[in-house]
A protein has these predicted regions:
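Active-site microenvironment for binding and transforming phosphate-containing groups
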Residues: 1-273
Length: 273
């Protein structure tokens, strides 16, 4: 179950994994004063000064970690709507904050403390995962799943990379964070045809349908990612799903569609104590 914790949204399933911290940010609690980025914008490319964005990362990192880590532990990357997942070590801490970003991609996995992977979104799907190795130590992941990354299977790729670091699949919990819901995600026929070509007509038919009273198809990124995680071996009861639609709740979250692209971005961060 998702719940509010001050300016954050959290997953009770992720909380079950000991020795970690996590959180999905909202628009609240930051230093941005521009109308479209107020107030916890986590992007340097949307109008805020570099100093303000750095302050926002500092707030976010300290809030999710309970004051243990600051912004210099965070890592972001240039997200490219792919299924590419990077392995991080504590030596990567600060990429995108105080030192240049590393290679492009859309997800992170780490088994190290001292580094906070942050996936960023403003309608796309942020996913956090956590599990344990046989020795009881945690492995965590943060993923940005746009529709292209979703159908390319980035959620399953994150599970695979976690296992490559020794994480035991039965221990993995996943939290699908706030994103644009089926209610608002209208798509065209070309979108449907593209997903059919990539994932098959049965998959597309399950997740891209025309709602009652609507004229066009809507895509369900929630159910797509839940199915992909299930096919990767994550049991349904270990997948937490936020009920919040970023477009419906654009006063709480940043939404690209609700604002015509004039917005900030929020973050999904996770780390090891």
């Amino acid at each position: 179950m998702f719940y509010a914790d001050g300016i954050l949204r959290k997953s009770s399933l992720i909380d079950e994994i000991p020795g970690i911290f996590h959180g999905f940010s909202t628009r609240f609690g930051g230093k941005s004063t521009l109308s479209h980025t107020a107030s916890l914008n986590l992007s340097h490319d949307l109008g805020d000064s570099a100093d303000i964005v750095r302050e926002n990362f500092e707030i976010f990192a300290r809030t999710i970690s309970g004051g243990v880590y600051g912004g210099n532990a965070t890592v972001t990357l240039h997200q490219i709507h792919s299924a590419k997942v990077r392995v991080l070590t504590r030596e990567n801490a600060g990429e995108g904050y105080s030192i240049p970003r590393g290679e492009d991609g859309d997800g992170f996995v780490t088994a190290d403390s001292g580094v906070i992977p942050v996936a960023r979104a403003a309608d796309c799907v942020p996913i956090l995962l956590a599990g344990l190795r046989a020795d009881g130590n945690p492995v965590v992941s943060a993923v940005h799943a746009g529709w292209r990354g979703t159908v390319a299977g980035i959620a399953a790729e994150a599970v695979r990379v976690m296992e490559s670091l020794g994480c035991e699949r039965p221990t993995i919990r996943a939290a699908i964070g706030p994103h644009i819901g089926y209610c608002c995600y209208e798509v065209g026929a070309d979108f449907y045809e593209t997903v059919c070509g990539l994932c098959g007509t049965e998959f597309a038919g399950r997740h891209i349908t025309i709602p009652d009273g609507k004229a066009k198809h809507h895509a369900n990124l929630t159910s797509m990612n839940a199915e992909i995680l299930g096919n990767a071996g994550i049991a349904a009861e270990k997948i937490d799903i936020s009920p919040d639609c970023t477009m419906c709740m654009s006063d709480v979250y940043y939404s690209h569609r609700a604002t015509g692209g004039k917005r900030g971005v929020h973050g999904a961060g996770i780390g090891i104590l």
